[in-house]
């Protein structure tokens, strides 16, 4: 067997962008080989199929997203501030001319009618993210309340990621967050924002 001359992570980073922009169905093997510089045989040997490559890309994206949540929580003065900063970052990202939303949410939307393994995988990653928020919120609230707040937060995140495609939506999103997540303003005594 020939030694592979590529790094799996580099390939995944390239295809994350491609799949994220185009979606699963609209991305061809030709586009993938052009973006990665690899031949189809190398891709199939490493990932078994286009579906396997897509799932590996989703997993890498989810890992980055989860790491970003933990980093934000670790660097903020409170869970309140971390959540606010993350929501503001999502809104800022939506202002970009090359805005792509969330890869996991876009996958859910694209593949919802099929309910296939990729859809289920994306859903599982989003559930995992919700549980991470739940764990952090549970430090401040009783479990039942924290669970409701984590679900509310995910609903707002989904909304930001989708509504972000609307031009000039940042002010509307900020006002909506304040209306939908009033508990966020009272979570921390040291919040001055």
PLM region descriptions:
Residues 59-65:
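Short, basic, alpha-helical segments at the C-terminal edge of helix-turn-helix-like DNA-binding modules
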């Amino acid at each position: 067997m020939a030694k592979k001359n590529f790094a799996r992570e580099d390939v995944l980073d390239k295809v994350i962008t491609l799949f994220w922009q185009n979606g699963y169905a609209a991305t061809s093997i030709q586009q993938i080989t052009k973006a990665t510089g690899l031949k189809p045989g190398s891709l199939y040997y490493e990932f078994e199929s286009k579906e396997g490559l897509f799932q590996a890309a989703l997993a890498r994206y989810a890992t980055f997203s989860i790491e970003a949540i933990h980093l934000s929580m670790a660097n903020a003065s409170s869970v309140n501030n971390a959540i606010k900063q993350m929501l503001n970052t999502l809104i800022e990202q939506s202002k970009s001319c090359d805005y792509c939303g969330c890869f996991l949410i876009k996958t859910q939307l694209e593949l919802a009618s099929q309910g296939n393994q990729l859809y289920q995988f994306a859903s599982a990653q989003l559930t995992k993210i919700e549980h991470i928020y739940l764990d952090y919120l549970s430090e401040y609230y009783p479990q039942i309340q924290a669970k409701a707040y984590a679900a509310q937060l995910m609903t707002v995140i989904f909304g930001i990621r989708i509504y972000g495609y609307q031009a000039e939506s940042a002010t509307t999103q900020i006002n909506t967050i304040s209306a939908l997540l009033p508990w966020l303003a009272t979570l921390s005594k040291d919040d001055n924002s």
